[in-house]
């Protein structure tokens, strides 16, 4: 049996049996129903902005929320998850797993703003000065491709790997 299958079993088992219980205990002050029950979610540290919702952004947001920060993720695209959602094919990483991870962050109190291109929609200075963020984590990933400057790379129908995967995964484009 391959190690990947064992890792998948453990992750699936954890998600089905332990994840909700663990999230309810985070920080002793946060309960999954705090916002719905009218209780305030207490935060002990400052307010943090996370730019990008790929693997680094999601991990950072989760760790900061567990430590007591008020965290908001700013994602440029319309779907949270970054390369996990648009760059990895479904057969390698089911999108439902990524959606579950994003949902876990929401239960931790993390807020997610999609369609927010920091640098165009808002600047980092505005995040700090006008919105009161104490810290900003920039986890924007590898969004821009490096071209090889070879003949034909600018022709119609020639895509970078990132553009191809984005078109196939988010836009459901047929090639």
Predicted regions and their residues:
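Local cysteine-cluster metal-coordination motifs and their immediate loop/turn environment
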Residues: 1
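Glycine-rich dinucleotide-binding loop and its adjacent helix/turn
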Residues: 6, 10-42, 100-117, 145-175
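Nucleotide donor/acceptor-binding cores
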Residues: 46
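Beta1-alpha1 glycine-rich phosphate/pyrophosphate-binding loop at the start
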Residues: 50-120, 146-153, 163
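Short hydrophobic core segments
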Residues: 51, 74, 132-141
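Conserved beta-strand-loop-beta-strand element in the redox core of flavoprotein oxidoreductases
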Residues: 114-136, 171-173
């Amino acid at each position: 049996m391959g190690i990947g299958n064992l890792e998948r079993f453990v992750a699936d088992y954890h998600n089905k049996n332990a994840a909700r219980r663990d999230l309810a205990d985070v920080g002793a002050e946060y309960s999954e129903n705090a916002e719905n029950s009218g209780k305030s979610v207490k935060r002990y540290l400052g307010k943090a902005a996370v730019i990008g919702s790929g693997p680094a952004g999601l991990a950072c947001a989760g760790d900061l929320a567990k430590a007591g920060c008020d965290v908001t993720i700013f994602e440029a695209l319309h779907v949270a998850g970054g390369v996990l959602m648009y760059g990895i094919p479904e057969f390698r990483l089911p999108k439902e797993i990524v959606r579950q991870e994003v949902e876990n962050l929401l239960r931790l109190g993390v807020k997610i703003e999609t369609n927010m291109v920091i640098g165009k929609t808002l600047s980092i200075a505005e995040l700090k000065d006008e919105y009161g963020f104490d810290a900003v984590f920039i986890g924007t990933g590898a969004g821009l491709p490096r071209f090889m400057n070879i003949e034909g790379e600018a022709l119609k129908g020639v895509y970078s790997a990132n553009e191809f995967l984005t078109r196939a995964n988010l836009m459901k484009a047929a090639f």
